[in-house]
């Protein structure tokens, strides 16, 4: 491994409509085959629907949904003396957001609604109300960490 300087992470530009870096990241995660304008229109239309349902602004509603899906702990495999343990570790803030967004997009893609914008709006509104597939995924991850709390001393 070369011992060169560590290259810093690139800053992503905030999205044009709301000026939010978090939303820009969400658009990038939703984007397929480099079709950013399509992804943006899906996200904006989903946020509009979400805002009408919740009575909050688009960004507030999105932030609430994201907050309810963010995991605080996860398990990582750690090999100790021939056996592999699932060790609970705290999730870094950047990864917390990335996982939450990824889970919301995955859950929305699996839904059976007509358009992707509607699926995304429904998943986000479910997440805002602490229900839905993405929230269930977070609960499963937390349950795994809780079950493997005994191996927490193997943390590195």
Curated annotation (Swiss-Prot):
Disulfide bonds: none
Database matches in NCBIfam families: rpsG_bact
Keyword vocabulary terms for this entry: Ribonucleoprotein, Ribosomal protein, RNA-binding, rRNA-binding, tRNA-binding
A biological process term (GO) from this entry: translation
Family: Belongs to the universal ribosomal protein uS7 family.
Record text on subunit structure and interactions: Part of the 30S ribosomal subunit. Contacts proteins S9 and S11.
PROSITE patterns (UniProt xref): RIBOSOMAL_S7
Signal peptide: none
Gene responsible for this protein: rpsG
Role according to the record: One of the primary rRNA binding proteins, it binds directly to 16S rRNA where it nucleates assembly of the head domain of the 30S subunit. Is located at the subunit interface close to the decoding center, probably blocks exit of the E-site tRNA.
Biological source species: Edwardsiella ictaluri (strain 93-146)
The protein, known as: Small ribosomal subunit protein uS7
InterPro entries named in the record: Ribosomal_uS7, Ribosomal_uS7_bac/org-type, Ribosomal_uS7_CS, Ribosomal_uS7_dom, Ribosomal_uS7_dom_sf
Superkingdom field: Bacteria
């Amino acid at each position: 491994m070369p011992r060169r300087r560590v290259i810093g992470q690139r800053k992503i530009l905030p999205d044009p409509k709301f000026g939010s870096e978090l939303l820009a990241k969400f658009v990038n995660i939703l984007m397929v085959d480099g079709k950013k304008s399509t992804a943006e229109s899906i996200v904006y239309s989903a946020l509009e629907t979400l805002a009408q349902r919740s009575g909050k602004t688009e960004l507030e509603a999105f932030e609430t949904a994201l907050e309810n899906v963010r995991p605080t702990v996860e398990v990582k495999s750690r090999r100790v003396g021939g056996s592999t343990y699932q060790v609970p570790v705290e999730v870094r803030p950047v990864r917390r957001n990335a996982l939450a967004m990824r889970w919301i997009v995955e859950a929305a893609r699996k839904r059976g609604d007509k358009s992707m914008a509607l699926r995304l709006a429904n998943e986000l509104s479910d997440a805002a109300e602490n229900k839905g597939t993405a929230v269930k995924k977070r609960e499963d991850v937390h349950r795994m960490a809780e079950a493997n709390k005994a191996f927490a001393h193997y943390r590195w």
